[in-house]
Amino acid sequence: MANIKSKEKRILTNEKARVRNAAMKSHVRLAIKKAKRAIEEKNENVEQLLKDAHKVINTSVSHGVFHRNNAARKSSRLDAYAFKIQNKTAN
């Protein structure tokens, strides 16, 4: 354990941030999985789930959990996956 008071405070704040970031990352992963599952099952609320996933991803950027390029890559890959699956079933 740290001997300096400011270091003890940093340890506590780092732990709070770690827990908060882990929860947000989990929320993002879950939203992406839900959207992908809906795409694969050709669910009627795919558009809403994609919109929700993009919203969660963008929120994680504003909270500082992900870098904006990382979030853009996640969103782009999700959209590309949706486009690929929808075009595959259309043919």
Swiss-Prot record:
It comes from the Bacteria. One of its GO terms (biological process) is translation. GO terms for molecular function: small ribosomal subunit rRNA binding; structural constituent of ribosome. Keywords: Ribonucleoprotein, Ribosomal protein, RNA-binding, rRNA-binding. It holds the Pfam family Ribosomal_S20p. GO terms for cellular component: cytosol; small ribosomal subunit. PANTHER family: 30S RIBOSOMAL PROTEIN S20, SMALL RIBOSOMAL SUBUNIT PROTEIN BS20C. Binds directly to 16S ribosomal RNA. Belongs to the bacterial ribosomal protein bS20 family. This is Small ribosomal subunit protein bS20. It comes from Mycoplasma mobile (strain ATCC 43663 / 163K / NCTC 11711) (Mesomycoplasma mobile).
